[in-house]
């Protein structure tokens, strides 16, 4: 059951990424048709923009991400218990030892970052380290180490970059149309061509809806990677109850004291901001109750 869950989560992520690239291609083709009367040029430009933006975000400095989240790097001497758990989990996962950081915050939370296992880092709040016992900490750190081993940070970064690229292209296309853009051929003879009018309307609709759809796909990818990391943590620790107990404590945690931006929020094991009342479709994290239920069904 455990390996089946891991396999299913990986397959769902692949499907979502394929749909994401298809959406980026669609929005590029739509913008190309509306502005240049050339599908292919718009499609190629959209994919190039998406790849460049994703590449630049992937190689964002680990130290910068930690600084944005008020995390301080610690040594084995400063936090021996935390350091040794990270070391043990990294050894089991067969990845290099990540850098270790602590966030001075009473809430219960942790996250990992880094584009690859070779430049990764793990951070935990002081509240988490004080409240959780060793088995629960192993579950949480196993979750974060799994993110590193599974290249989740890179996948999530690509998803954020693609969503941003879709929004930018859609915004530029919409503004150019609003201020009189569009191909001359569309303005000259489009009114008499029913097919062209239908295509024009569909292209406009895609420009309007694409940013929302892109955000939903990006959030869905984030939620799938959380499920995968939960299951992968159990694979590392061989202790599902430790992870379940940790999630039950996380469920009672208060929001973090310092502001957390959207990109950073998706990295944490638990939503670090005040819980929102709207649909889980718009959440970076799946409901903790559902995560616990999946672990119990392994």
From Swiss-Prot:
GO terms for molecular function: metalloendopeptidase activity; zinc ion binding. Its cofactor is Zn(2+). It comes from the Bacteria. Its EC number is 3.4.24.-. Keywords: Cell membrane, Hydrolase, Membrane, Metal-binding, Metalloprotease, Protease, Transmembrane, Transmembrane helix, Zinc. It is found in: Cell membrane. It is a multi-pass membrane protein. The chain crosses the membrane at residues 14-34, 39-59, 158-178, 197-217. The keyword Membrane applies. The active site is at residue 144. Zn(2+) binds at residues 143, 147, 226. It holds the Pfam family Peptidase_M48. The keyword Translocase does not apply. GO terms for biological process: proteolysis. Binds 1 zinc ion per subunit. One of its GO terms (cellular component) is plasma membrane. It is an enzyme of class 3 (hydrolase). Belongs to the peptidase M48B family. This is Protease HtpX homolog. It comes from Streptococcus pyogenes serotype M28 (strain MGAS6180). The gene is htpX.
